[in-house]
């Protein structure tokens, strides 16, 4: 679970990255699709070019990071705050919840690239814990 310190670190970092969140989301999603090609199955209607600069990846990256922003605002109740998104991914999109952890890995990587001075080991730990809790909350409707 997230401590008060973890929550404060995540909120402080989000304040810094929110303005670039769409760009970070596109980079994270694009990296995931290249590095973990099995995830492309969920985006087959987008064609073969799924790099970070393609319009579809840029748009969905922005959607993903908007959801992360919503999660930051709902940090004290992630399951409730992400309930509709969990339902969408479980019942309509049928996304394997293991992919949430893969995306979280790529989000962490991209944050560290864009904000190296802010991404201390302590912040890394808090963000990792937060994204693990977010992935768990998104998996709630799968049970």
Swiss-Prot record:
Positions annotated to bind heme b: 89
Sequence positions bearing N-acetylserine: 1
GO biological process, one term: hydrogen peroxide catabolic process
Transmembrane segments: none
Alphabetized InterPro entries for the sequence: Globin (IPR000971), Globin-like_sf (IPR009050), Globin/Proto (IPR012292), Hemoglobin_a-typ (IPR002338), Hemoglobin_oxygen_transport (IPR050056)
Example GO molecular function: metal ion binding
Keyword tags: Acetylation, Heme, Iron, Metal-binding, Oxygen transport, Transport
Cellular component GO terms held in the UniProt record: blood microparticle; haptoglobin-hemoglobin complex; hemoglobin complex
Any Pfam family matching the protein: Globin
Binding site for O2: 60
Tissues showing expression: Red blood cells.
Domain Globin: 1-143
Role noted for this protein: Involved in oxygen transport from gills to the various peripheral tissues.
Sequence similarity: Belongs to the globin family.
Subunit details: Heterotetramer of two alpha chains and two beta chains.
Name the UniProt record assigns to this protein: Hemoglobin subunit alpha
Species, as recorded: Leiostomus xanthurus (Spot)
Gene name of the record: hba
